[in-house]
Amino acid sequence: MPQSTIVKEEKQMVPRLTTALNGPLLSLEKSMLDGMPKIEHWFRTKWLDYSAPFYASVDLRNAGFKLAPVDTNLFPGGFNNLSAEFLPLSVQAAMVAVEKICPEAHRLLIIPENHTRNTYYLRNVVELANILRQAGMNVRIGSISPEITEPTILEAQGGMPLLLEPVVRVGNRLKLLNKDLGDFDSCAILLNNDLSAGIPDILKNLEQDLIPPLHAGWSTRRKSQHFAAYNKVAQEFSELLGIDEWLINPYFETCGEIDFHARTGEDCLALKVEQLLDKIKIKYAEYGVTQEPFVIVKADAGTYGMGIMTVKSPDDVRDLNRKARNKMAVVKEGLQVSEVIIQEGVYTFESVDDGVAEPVVYMMDHFVIGGFYRVHTERGMDENLNAPGSHFSPLAFQKPCTLPDCAGDPDAAPNRFYAYGVVARLALLAAAMELQEQDPLNS
């Protein structure tokens, strides 16, 4: 995840919603408040049919007239950005999540990303391990990086020490062999590594429970599969509440067989961009939105905000210069982009001081455990705020996403956060459906 600064305690605020056109959103938030018993009952019935991912984070965008998820991460890397006040929520949710997957588990091995230079990411691992330890687990951190050949203490952000131990495969189990601390044979393995570079042999065919499952990694997962599942969820939820599905659901298209270096697939991309922009214009006219429609073109597989661009015209993808093509051609781990998703762009009209803000909601099992705002002073309201090399300031949510004030204004802080929690849980449910559909054991 891109570098960030740690939450400052004096920032006890909620971003301003700087748009005059907030009628549709206030109506949506009011529908959620009025329908809260119905919504919570609906979620409970859904979780009887689907197993929630162990953990997830959802990036949302609030345009004042639309509130929608734009990305769902099944290997969240920002636990360091959550408010310490929500730790009890996290611990309770972690207890439930562990009990469901491995009820007898008391030892848990966390396998983080291989990179060890991002001190903020390392602090995320420290905080994640702390949550799980407080949930009653014996937790150690094991690395599958070839660079970690002996127990190594790294310094995480804030000077926090993090002990990484090399993982050893013994038969079909992963273990830590440590003369000083004793050997460690865990009941379950928690991946905080999104497998962008592929599934390493050391993780294949293990006896231990592996969470999330291997097919949740970006070597097999596709954003388009997720948003296809989200289409189904959003449609059913919108019928339940009697709202326009578009208010919570971004349109999307896909293009396969793209090669940005060779410039193959450009015509497909330009055509899909044009078609999507035309669809968005119709909805903008319906709701009186005067902003210019835009789409986001991004790699269908991958994370870290790489391989992403904002597009407002088909010509934007036909006239890419070499620098732009190079930027779009590869994602994390240097992998080539061959498939893209073209997603309706959702403006963010939330701001803090001089920065554009977008909410990120964190969940464990099917519980919302908190969240934060990415606040970016150098990007626009139509740009991706999660990008390599960018510096965003996390602003921890000061209110939980589970306790609306039904007597208050629809856009009062608890109610806005409740709406965030609802839409994030819709994306979580879509991820659960997606994982079930893509599970190789079900094929």
Located regions from the model:
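Short solvent-exposed loop/turn micro-motifs enriched in small/polar/acidic residues
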Residues: 51-54, 132, 182, 353-356
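Conserved N-proximal alpha/beta basic substrate-recognition cap immediately N-terminal to
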Residues: 93, 116-136, 143-291
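Phosphate-binding site of ATP-dependent enzymes
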Residues: 66, 272-294, 301-306, 312-395
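Low-complexity, highly charged intrinsically disordered N-terminal segments
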Residues: 1-40, 50, 56-57, 63-65, ...
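Conserved metal-phosphate-binding beta-hairpin within the catalytic cores
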Residues: 51-76, 298, 345, 357-366, ...
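Peripheral (often C-terminal) accessory segments that flank ATP-dependent C-N-forming ligase machineries
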Residues: 1, 5-12, 365-366, 375-443
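N-terminal beta-alpha lobe that positions the nucleotide/phosphoryl donor
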Residues: 38-42, 57, 76, 109, ...
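Short, flexible loop/turn elements at secondary-structure junctions
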Residues: 59-64, 74-76, 114, 168, ...
